[in-house]
Amino acid sequence: MENISEKIPGIGRIEPYRDEVTNNLYLLFRDKGFAKPFNQRQMSDGTLKMLCYLLLIYDPNPAPFICIEEPENGLYHQLVSALVNELRDHATGRKNGSQIFITTHQPYLVDAMQPEEVWILKKEKMDFRLYNVLVKFLM
C-alpha cells in the first residue's frame, strides 16, 4: 500500500482497519493536513477511482488483459497524465505486465499518450477500420 499511497496526491498513508464489532475491513487514509485518519467514505470519487486503478495494476498476479472505459471520468485532470504513465509502466515495464485497452473521447487523455499507443476505431458504412495514429497520420 505504500507504493500506491505515494502516487495519490494528498494521501500520506493507507492502512487497513478491521472493525471488531462487524468484522468489516476498511481502509484508513492518513494525510499530513489532518490529525485523524479518514475512511474511504470520506474520499472523493476521483481519488477512489485512482486508487482502484492502481490496485488493479499493482496486483501481484494481474489480469493478462485489462479494459478500461473512459478512465478520465471523475478524475482530476492532472491525475490523468499520472494514470497514463502508471498504466504504461505496468504494461511495458515489468514481467507479467498486462495488455491494456482504453477507450476515450477526451483529447487530454490522448495527449498524455505516445502516438504509437493511440489507435482509432472508425465506422465506415457497414464496416469498421482500425488505424494506428503513428502509421496513419505521422508517417
Task: List each language-model region with its residue ranges.
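Conserved ABC ATPase signature
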Residues: S5-Y58, I68-H77
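Secondary-structure boundary motif
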Residues: E6, D59, D89-G93
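Substrate-recognition/cap regions that form aromatic- and gly/pro-loop-enriched pockets
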Residues: I57, A63-F65, H77-L87
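Loop/turn-to-beta-strand initiation segments
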Residues: P62-P64, Y76, K95-F101
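C-terminal lobe/lid and adjacent interdomain/linker elements of RecA-like ASCE P-loop ATPase modules
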Residues: S81-M139
